[in-house]
Amino acid sequence: ELGYPIDTTSDNYYNWGQGTIAHNTVLVNDRRQTYEKTRVDAPIHYDGDGLVKLMDVDAPTRYGATSIYRRSVVMVNVDDDVSYGVDFFRVKGGNEHLYSFHSLADEIFETENLEFTKQANANGEYIGSYVGPNVNYGTTGISNGFSWLKNVERDRAVEEKNIAVDFQIKDFRNQFRETRNLHLRMTMLNSFT
């Protein structure tokens, strides 16, 4: 989670910040999760002590189309400089599942098993948003948040494959005490269904 740095009265907040896709989670059928302040999901397990931390939550009613919507996250601190997380996200139901992952980076450092095609005009300039080339960045009224994703590049491969993306972290808010070469690497394994 990247926190909440945006103004709660802006279009960005209502069209992006409140959306499921903004929060490193799984979007089902291109729709936001249902949100009710009175709903309590089921925390299965939590252990925040020691070098290995674990959280397991079940939230099957977040989407009407799902019977399973469960996330288990393990964080492991190897030493002062290295840590890693393992994210098991299980979803059953719905027709499409989109795992959203982003970081404090404005470019991708390197990838494995991905061949991106830039969504661009004839001059090679980025156009549109994740909705498509004809829907501009920041277009309001699209509740899934896709119009708030720009500089779109897609891998059109249809086969399941393991992929990896390495983000070089950028200190957008000047929070680091010293300049560091920080990276966040995400490795996705293909389906285990």
Please identify what each model-predicted range represents.
Residues 104-190:
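Polysaccharide-binding surfaces and accessory modules of carbohydrate-active proteins
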Residues 1-131, 135, 142:
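Catalytic and substrate-binding regions of extracellular carbohydrate-active enzymes
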